[in-house]
């Protein structure tokens, strides 16, 4: 284990002491998780949930979403924003899955080699590394580490990520730093750190539990 991995584990353990071990939420079926994560893009959790619940209220099944008039899907998911983009995208993905698999059952991804499952998901337009990792980790309990904007910002400031590394490159890189059994808790606790303390603007460095392990120098002007 290299020094950077040791540092990542130390940071993880400190966050566990401060925030606790996150409780595993009841996993959504993979198609539900996929749609929910697409809806979450460029919006907050509240708006994502409003759109997801509206979609499930209006349409009894994902097959019904797939076959619905696009304008009706767009209307249902409007709370999530970018509905004119997300609505057709969700329907196209549902159609493509059905054409290839014969149904909307994605449970087969649990048995594929991890990288094959990841590649299968990211073939679809609108499904990037983060969306694929969320489906794999949260729904299928696969060892994938999703990197959102909070995690990308926090790990960059801390010094876990090399300078100029892209968010896409950060996914496999952080998977190599953190042990697989820590992915779920590390993901959620780093997000919490980013939301509550390590803000994009004016991070609350004096109250940061990992400030002694952080490379970031706050601006004083």
Question: Where are the regions that the model predicts?
Answer:
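Catalytic cores of DNA base-excision repair glycosylases
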Residues: 2-221
